[in-house]
């Protein structure tokens, strides 16, 4: 898989920030590499917020032909895997700036 190969190559670097998007952390090889060698953050929003964002995005190929129920099922399934991240940030009531500040603070403390 080309995405896996490229991502694993990128993850060999240090002092980088990588946003893995929807499916990256789902991949077991990628997830293991991240959890072993890097800080990992789960930026968690409630399911309704995620559903709204996914449905309104034109860049979400899985959502184009999916029902709300199917998307919610996928969110629930993926959340179980995302929750394996080292750090979790509840983003429901945070601005982008507040989220960035939290990530930086956690990084600096570790």
Residue ranges, per PLM feature:
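ATP-dependent small-molecule kinase phosphotransfer cores
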Residues: 1-35, 60, 68, 79
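Alpha-helical elements of Rossmann-like donor-binding domains used by nucleotide-donor carbohydrate transfer enzymes
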Residues: 5-6, 49, 98, 102
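NTP-dependent small-molecule kinase module
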Residues: 13, 39, 76-110
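Catalytic metal- and UDP-sugar-binding loop of GT-A-like glycosyltransferases, i.e.
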Residues: 20, 43, 91
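Short glycine-rich anion-binding loops that position phosphate/pyrophosphate groups of nucleotides
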Residues: 22-25, 46-48, 94
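Short amphipathic alpha-helical segments
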Residues: 29-32, 52-56, 101-102
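A glycine- and Lys/Arg-enriched "phosphate-lid" helix/loop adjacent to the NTP-binding pocket
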Residues: 37-80
């Amino acid at each position: 898989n080309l995405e896996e190969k490229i991502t694993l190559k990128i993850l060999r670097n240090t002092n980088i920030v990588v946003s893995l998007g929807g499916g990256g952390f789902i991949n077991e090889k990628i997830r293991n590499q991240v959890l072993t060698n890097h800080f990992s953050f789960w930026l968690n929003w409630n399911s309704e917020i995620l559903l709204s964002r996914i449905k309104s995005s034109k860049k979400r190929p899985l959502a184009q032909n999916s029902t709300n129920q199917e998307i919610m099922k996928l969110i629930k399934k993926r959340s179980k895997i995302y929750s394996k991240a080292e750090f979790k940030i509840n983003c429901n009531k945070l601005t982008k700036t507040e989220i960035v500040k939290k990530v930086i603070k956690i990084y600096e403390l570790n």
